[in-house]
UniProtKB/Swiss-Prot annotation:
Keyword NAD: no
Alphabetic keyword roster: PQQ biosynthesis
Protein name as catalogued: Coenzyme PQQ synthesis protein A
Gene Ontology terms describing biological process: pyrroloquinoline quinone biosynthetic process
Protein's organism: Methylorubrum extorquens (strain ATCC 14718 / DSM 1338 / JCM 2805 / NCIMB 9133 / AM1)
């Protein structure tokens, strides 16, 4: 189960980056 925590945190970071990039794109458009 040691792999569970890193994967969850990685998914959270990925979602944050995606939403951040989407917000930037919406602002510029």
């Amino acid at each position: 189960m040691k792999w569970a925590a890193p994967i969850v945190s990685e998914i959270c970071v990925g979602m944050e980056v995606t939403s951040y990039e989407s917000a930037e794109i919406d602002t510029f458009n």
